[in-house]
Amino acid sequence: MKHLEKIKLIQGGMGVHVSNWRLARAVAMQRPGVTVGTVSGTALDIVYVRLLQLGDPGGHARRALRSLDEQFDVDIGRRICERYFIEGGKAPQDRFRSAPMQIVRAHDGRRTFPMPNGSAVTTPLKLDDEIIELLIATGFVEVWLAKEGHNGKIFINFLNKIELPLIYVLYGAMLAGVDGVIVGAGNPEGLPALCRRLATHEAVAHEISVLYRETGEEFVIAFDPKEIAGARFAAKPLETPVFLAIVSLEDLVKALAESPSAPPDGFIIEHHTAGGHNANPIGPLRRDARGQPIYSSRDEANLAAIRAVGIPFWLAGGYGSHARLQEALAAGANGVQVGTVFALAEESGMKPEYRSAILAALKDGVKDEDLVQTTVFSPTGFSFKVVQIQETLSDDDVYASRRRICDIGMLQQRGFGKPDEQGERTLFQRCPAGPIENFVKNRGLERNTDERRCLCNGLLACVGLGQVKEIQGEVVEEPAIVTLGNHLDGVRRLSRQGQTHYYVQDVIADILG
């Protein structure tokens, strides 16, 4: 854990493939040990299934999949390529073939469950083996590519709310030697200990949420690494990555520090001005005249209390400058985590047209508060920052004209229907951003679908991997959704008010000096 002490700048994990292996690798190579690159662990199965169908530009995915097969004497990578790779890429008008939906089942394949008899019961659930292999492989690929050819540190970021793929992608990342794990959007209790068990290939179980369960019922994703690929992955122990929990207030810091299983190795204290998902304001939701949620002093972290816990921490949310780094260090932090200014660097995975649109808005004098707004768009229920760009999902007309569909399902909720006459309950999966009738049919309230927008398809479109369809002879791509933090001063400074593009090395020099 000694390398944590040197880390001054962590590049944040962002969106779906915005903080991809290229960006993370560039950051990690700048000042090894001081700067850390972070890849996003979100939707990697979808990302690589689609990249392979685009012909795998540069051959990077296939190279990493070959390394997986050769290193562990498996044929998982070969089978993935056979299934999805298209030489020269698919035709622009052709739809992407879908990765398998992550449908959770009992270990015997059932999706119906009897009512419990009143005693406490833990039920293990799993995904299909094909999906598990794809998740492990793509977690490996992203980290392997990020770590290739240098000795810098690479972390991987997860949203705790995306529960089903987490432990499988994490295991794949660990097979590739990931140096650290960052988890936000929820309480990550139990995950630091789970990392340690995965390092020795032990069977693990991670609790997941299931709505309308009975008192005393618990459901877990259960995974035994030795049951995959003939136990070939389990031939020798792995390095245990450091674990950082993203939190907003000192209460969760104290609770996790006293974890009965294992505390995190560090914390990222994220202010509500950071991009992506944020904690909601404490207490009843109030809005200002512009419709933005009102945060108060109750939503500000007590840094003295966090410092007293004695575990390293980094500050995030508006810390993308040398002056703010110095403030963080003076407050007792080890350093800062920065996202927004990296998201607009040339190495990021954001589609160039959206980077250019944002820089053009800055050049035209659009104010930060008009360009980035806090919304209730996310199906998670967390606040979510959205950049206001025409012809994206930030546009109400675009949202209204898009047919609701849930064909990826990363943010689906799981729950039980009402028991039948035999006391059997069917496990459903639903999303507030999906078809309203399906949400209501599965015990949802229609009002909870208001303003909910499809982040899965929107964030994939943000990085040029949006699904396509043909409408009256015209190829139409899913509308994108773009997220940044509230503070764009670093972007303004480096781009000279939107007049020029910039690179990772410029960001590092600007923040670290």
Predicted regions and their residues:
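Hydrophobic residues within well-ordered alpha-helices
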Residues: 27, 328-329
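Active-site entrance/lid segments in N-terminal catalytic domains of soluble metabolic enzymes
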Residues: 1-308, 486-513
